UniProtKB/Swiss-Prot annotation:
Organism: Danio rerio
Compositional bias (Low complexity): 538-547
Main localization category: endoplasmic reticulum
Location(s), subcellular: Endoplasmic reticulum membrane; Golgi apparatus membrane; Nucleus membrane
Segments of this protein annotated with the region Disordered: 398-553
Name recorded for this polypeptide: Chloride channel CLIC-like protein 1
TM segment ranges: 212-235, 241-260, 358-380
Lineage: Eukaryota, Metazoa, Chordata, Craniata, Vertebrata
Tissue expression summary: Expressed in the hindbrain, swim bladder and the eye at 1 day post fertilization (dpf) with increased expression at 3 dpf. At 3 dpf, most prominent expression in the retina, with strong expression in the ganglion cell layer, outer nuclear layer and the retinal pigmented epithelium.
Function: Seems to act as a chloride ion channel. Plays a role in retina development.
BP term (GO), one: retina development in camera-type eye
Similarity remark: Belongs to the chloride channel MCLC family.
PANTHER family per the UniProt record, alphabetical: CHLORIDE CHANNEL CLIC-LIKE PROTEIN 1
Position of the signal peptide: 1-25
GO cellular component: chloride channel complex; endoplasmic reticulum; endoplasmic reticulum membrane; Golgi membrane; membrane; nuclear membrane
Length: 609
């Protein structure tokens, strides 16, 4: 097929145009390549070592004075600037070439060794694989804590040390095997297992240490304290019971509070379904209204909202008052022992009667019941007599000892009545209890006149007192004759005692002398008023050592008061029994004569007139 001339001409023009475009594009590429491939040695700041081309400068092209600015090719000026110093450039080139050779030798030596990077890549991949089984951190959990066991053998340790010491003997396979066996058994971190425990440090349980310490403390308390030998067992049991009862109150209160708290939690769960209805979050429909009407009309159920707010507002601690704890403690104190005793008796009877025939079970049961009743009755009687000590039949109740420095009030004898004399002075009634009260009532005139020979021994008694205060004298205590009181056994065991003179005896003697002077003045005044005319008759008196004084109260059954005075003297540390006179009237300081009351250094007996 032949083409027309016009079509052939158009085709030629199109081919020419296409060739022209190809030539121009090739020219542009060559120019651009040459432009970008050219490196300015004076502008190394804009040199990019990665692409090995010059960066395009952002500086303005109008600055002609910048030395590092790459000059554009100017057709008008084709002169190439010469190097200012050729030798200096050559010198720098040699230095750079030398440094380049050194770096090349180092890199060659490094590349000659086996590369350990793949080993650590495999180790890290294994680590991530094991931890991914337990869970990896994500957006919800920023960090996770894992636990793993480290297994290290001798060969693995040697390979790791070779790598750390930069030795050439280590290999990639040995290192890979060593790292793969280090971390085994991955698991999540257990915080409780890592807490400090007393057992891990001291290898002993805390409970064992506390029990041993308590036993040692009890032993030390028993050895050191003296209460076990002084206080009676009944008093110790009573104190222990009081302490146990107080501890039981607190114990039961905490127990009741825990029970109330647990009940409160259970009620909260039960009334949770009424939350929306009682708080108004849910509107009541016709079914709820119908059920509410049925509850109020036909049932006796409480309002669920009332129960809901009671559970919500009332604190469980208010449900356990102290009175409730006291009541339950007393109830448990009475019922729990009986319950345990009944269980023990039941098990005992069951074990006793199970192998006996029926004919013997009834007699054995009766005997066991009688034995239990007798034991309970005897224990109750002993406890009652221990708590409340009733006076025995035929014995008089023991009177409490008088206070320190206080005289016991005189008592009339049972067979005598008070004397009647009107307003006139009458002699004090004579007590036959002991010699102390017998001599203590000598302030009365009648008694003084009856015992005039003894009142003449003033000087001799003063000598005896001075002798007693300057030396140690054995004191002998006499035991009353007749019916003895059980508590007087200690006086018979302490018949001979040695008394040391000291500050207490000297102070007592001074007080006695002062009181004697006052009593002597009163006695002299009364004696002058009632003095008899037959005063000049001879007086015969025995020396003090031979005075025979018989205890009056011993034969009259008043030994109880003597024992009481001895106890009182022993409790207050007084080793000397000094009997003082009782002042019956006011003292007169201007009387010249003085008389003294009797003070006995040795217990003597007085003849009964």
């Amino acid at each position: 097929m032949k083409l027309s001339s016009s079509s052939s001409f158009g085709l030629c023009i199109l081919v020419v145009f296409f060739c022209f475009v190809v030539i121009e594009s090739a020219k542009i590429r060559i120019d651009g390549y040459n432009d970008e491939a050219w490196i300015d040695p004076y502008d190394m700041l804009n040199y990019d070592p990665t692409t090995k081309r010059m960066r395009k400068s952002t500086e303005s092209e109008s600055y002609q004075n910048v030395p590092t600015k790459r000059r554009e090719f100017n057709s008008e000026s084709c002169d190439v600037p010469k190097c200012p110093d050729e030798h200096e450039c050559i010198k720098k080139l040699h230095i750079l070439q030398k440094e380049f050779d050194e770096q090349k030798s180092k890199s060659t030596a490094t590349l000659s060794k086996p590369v350990c990077l793949p080993v650590f890549k495999r180790f890290l991949s294994k680590l991530l694989k094991e931890t991914s089984k337990l869970g990896l951190p994500d957006d919800g959990i920023t960090a996770m804590h894992y636990d793993a066991e480290v297994k290290l053998s001798k060969q693995s340790l040697a390979e790791i040390q070779k790598l750390l010491n930069d030795e050439d003997g280590w290999t990639t396979g040995a290192m890979d095997e060593a790292l793969s066996q280090i971390l085994v058994q991955f698991k999540l971190h257990d915080y409780e297992a890592w807490k400090w425990r007393f057992e891990d440090t001291f290898h002993v349980d805390v409970d064992t240490v506390l029990k041993v310490s308590l036993i040692v403390l009890i032993i030390v308390a028993i050895i050191c304290t003296q209460l076990w030998s002084v206080v009676s067992w009944f008093v110790q049991f009573r104190r222990m019971f009081a302490v146990s009862f107080f501890i039981s109150l607190i114990w039961n209160w905490f127990h009741l509070y825990m029970l109330a708290f647990a009940e409160h939690k259970k009620n909260i769960v039960q009334v949770e379904s009424f939350n929306a209805k009682c708080t108004g979050l849910k509107q009541l429909n016709w079914q709820d209204s119908l059920s509410e009407w049925y509850r109020r009309t036909w049932t006796l159920q409480d309002d669920p909202c009332k129960k809901y707010y009671e559970v919500l507002v009332v604190n469980p601690i208010l449900l356990v008052p102290p009175t409730k704890a006291i009541t339950i403690t007393i109830t448990n104190f009475i019922t729990d022992p009986l319950k345990h005793i009944g269980e023990g008796i039941s098990e005992f009877l069951r074990a006793l009667l199970k192998d006996l025939p029926v004919t013997l079970q009834i007699p054995v049961l009766i005997i066991i019941i009688l034995a239990i009743l007798i034991f309970v009755y005897g224990s109750a009687q002993a406890a009652i007599h221990q708590v409340a000590r009733f006076p025995r039949l035929g014995w008089r109740q023991e009177q409490p000892p008088p206070a320190v420095g206080q005289r016991q009030n005189p008592q009339l004898r049972a067979h005598e009545e008070p004397w009647e004399g009107g307003d006139a002075r009458q002699p004090l009634p004579m007590r036959q209890d002991n010699r102390g009260n017998h001599v203590g009532n000598r302030g009365d005139q009648g008694f003084r006149d009856a015992n005039a020979p003894e009142n003449r021994e003033e000087d001799r008694s003063m000598d005896i007192r001075q002798e007693f205060s300057t030396k140690r004298t054995p004191v002998e205590t006499l035991q009353a004759t007749g019916n003895t009181f059980p508590d007087d056994e200690t006086d018979s065991q302490q018949r001979t005692q040695e008394l040391d003179s000291g500050a207490n005896v000297e102070e007592e003697v001074k007080v006695e002398e002062k009181e004697k002077k006052e009593s002597f003045s009163v006695d002299n005044k009364e004696q002058k008023e009632t003095k008899s005319p037959d005063r000049s008759e001879p007086i015969t008196s025995e020396p003090p050592s031979s005075i025979d004084v018989k205890t009056v109260g011993a034969d009259q059954g008043n030994e109880h008061l003597m024992c009481t005075k001895r106890k009182w003297a022993a409790q207050n540390g007084f080793k000397l029994q000094v009997i003082l006179c009782e002042i019956n009237s006011e003292a007169s300081a201007d009387l010249p004569e003085e008389e003294e009351c009797f003070s006995f250094k040795h217990p003597v007996q007085e003849t009964q007139s």
